Amino acid sequence: MTDQHSFETLAIHAGNTADPLTGAVVPPIYQVSTYKQDGVGGLRGGYEYSRSANPTRTALEENLAALEGGRRGLAFASGLAAEDCLLRTLLTPGDHVVIPDDAYGGTFRLFAKVASRWGVEFSVADTSDVAAVRAAITPRTKAVWVETPSNPLLGITDIAAVADVARQAGARLVVDNTFASPYLQQPLALGADVVVHSTTKYMGGHSDVVGGALVVNDKGLAEELAFHQNAMGAVAGPFDAWLVLRGIKTLAVRMDRHTENAGRIAELLTRHPAVTQVLYPGLPDHPGHEIAAKQMRAFGGMVSFRVRGGEQAAVDVCNRAELFTLGESLGGVESLLEHPGRMTHASAAGSPLEVPADLVRLSVGIENGDDLLADLAQALG
């Protein structure tokens, strides 16, 4: 398998070599903690203990690297475990990070409640504004953190432009690519140093696994991250790794359907009198539309909107939905909706990252589009 193959082919075959003993075309689940050695130090394939390495996890990590066009992929027990490993690898007490002013609530909590306790400082900036990012950088800035599209406001950051700003400051650019997936966007090719994923979401794609990933190109950074991954221990288990690998095989076809349905829903919302604003980068009037069109293959399956009537009206929409399941997370084959202010982003309440109280976030699934439109129309009233 080479990088000359198309994304769809890599998704199915990269890291997925046939089992040498049986010829099984799907990598086995190596549900094992330790490995027999051929004499002291005589490791087979470098495997000694599954926290350090496991063949099923290796297959996933090779696949992740291929899909993002990176040198090394690392799989973790959750997206936040991946982020924590990255912070501990890149930063020391007194260092500074620029994060988005609309970051995922869990990421904000990690910086505000955990990293800050061991001396890491951060400031927030509108990362869709390159000048604002530049202004937020200090002499102690070691990383610029970007989500694009962002969660839950669907903001778009020009990855290449911010990469230049970070590079000039001697800082690394970290891009959370969860909302886009590597099928729609490949940040390393645009100048990012690190790509972060919650593989729970589109990569797994079936709402049955929790996982995270980091992908990098720099060999030295890859080795440092691998050291911390092993030292900290929050690795993906073999069954979880296998589930993500299984999900990735259909990532391309799923993302095409997610995007198709999301585009139709965004158009419906723009015409509905109960909606005051639609946040979807595929709409021509979205402020990041042109940049998204430049750096993404398509616009993805996430849509947020604001409801006329305020917070209670937004909550009522969530409660009236039937086909859209009220729940947190995103990226599965089934459609979900939530009230971010009371659910996924409750930890940002009272902070500069607090989300609008009238906001509803949709994770648009791959069901029949007409069925989804009908359910949303009745939920809006």
Where are these regions (language model features)?
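Conserved PLP-enzyme active-site core in the AAT-like
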Residues: 2, 13, 72-274, 279
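N-terminal glycine-rich, Lys/His-bearing helix-loop that initiates the first secondary-structure elements
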Residues: 1-47
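Conserved N-terminal alpha-helix of the aminotransferase class I/II PLP-enzyme fold
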Residues: 34-84, 106-113
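PLP-dependent enzyme catalytic core of the Aspartate aminotransferase-like
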Residues: 112, 121-123, 139-142, 319, ...
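Conserved small-domain helix->loop->beta segment predominantly found in fold-type I
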Residues: 263-322, 326-328, 347-354
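Positively charged, small/polar-rich N-terminal and surface patches that mediate targeting and assembly
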Residues: 2-4, 8, 55, 277, ...
